[in-house]
């Protein structure tokens, strides 16, 4: 079993991204995973998932979602 990491932000905190593609953007923490040390910030770090067509879904689609980022890449604003 993994040891849970101590994270310096809480759900609802406004944070500023300090590294990466979304550097200097500000968002609100919406979810925290203490086992991996990652957080999801609303409106930051969007990724795309391509879904192939299959029997139940006859047309493919592209879904957009917010990917988690490590808590060390943000600071409280």
UniProtKB/Swiss-Prot annotation:
* UniProt-listed SMART domains: KOW (SM00739)
Q: Does the keyword Endoplasmic reticulum apply?
A: no
Record localization: Plastid, Chloroplast
Tell me a Gene Ontology molecular-function term this record carries.
Answer: structural constituent of ribosome
Q: Which GO terms describe its biological process?
A: translation
Briefly state the protein's biological role. One of two assembly initiator proteins, it binds directly to the 5'-end of the 23S rRNA, where it nucleates assembly of the 50S subunit.
The record's subunit annotation is: Part of the 50S ribosomal subunit.
* Name this protein carries in UniProt: Large ribosomal subunit protein uL24c
Organism in which the protein naturally occurs: Trieres chinensis
